């Protein structure tokens, strides 16, 4: 990209003069011809003035996952790194707090927050008393008070079912994880499983025997659940599975490969996330690409709307995803 120095050389004026003209310094007295030459040089060199963003202070990033949960699912680690990178790009002075720190560790002078993870009712009440400005990524735990940005998992689930049925699959299973409700400590059904059940029921295709779910979204969980499906169903194994997330899908592929079950000729697999190694597993994974950069960028922008522009209307933003077709589905 062209610099002030480049424009000064092109136009034949000093760097100081060029800088003051391009920054509309009203105290500078130069002929109109000089200004015109500088503007022409800037246009010729495709110069774009850098936007100086005001510093936004006292922002908290609540990363409410354990180290084990992050290790099991690279999706969240990628999200954390992206939020921290974008905070710098948008000139946001942000401090990261982890679940081990506890909600009480967040200081009273906090102006706003971005949050990832699962929060209890008590923690949400604490945040409501702390600030009006907050954005959750990947969940909507308090839509009456705080913004959220999340991938449209329900739509991805319906699209998966539609694609598989269009390809002639009549028996479709689901393998996924569950979440622990922080208020009850009980396992709860994920939105992907909820949508799969309701949509398959609408199509009169739901078969409870084909659904295998257990807490966690790890490779190990996927391996264990697909192994259980193979052992339980035998020759009645469905011809396709929707998998809730790529780490689970990797474990499922391992189990199928170990048993010599052909993918995709015998069982097709479709997953969600498109994590970095999805294209390197055997066979390469057909999966929805969730744009984590876009999720996080929208979260930062929504927070700045609240903090800087004083917006009070609560927003919930769903982000779509592109299906990346590889060799695990036919």
Swiss-Prot record:
Keyword check for Phosphoprotein: no
SMART domains reported for this sequence: HTH_LACI
GO MF entries: DNA-binding transcription factor activity; transcription cis-regulatory region binding
DNA-binding feature ranges: 4-23
Keywords for the protein's UniProt record, in alphabetical order: DNA-binding, Repressor, Transcription, Transcription regulation
Record function comment: Negatively regulates the expression of the ganSPQAB operon. Inhibits transcription of the operon by binding to an operator in the promoter region. In the presence of galactobiose, GanR dissociates from the promoter, resulting in the expression of the gan operon.
Name used for this protein in its record: HTH-type transcriptional regulator GanR
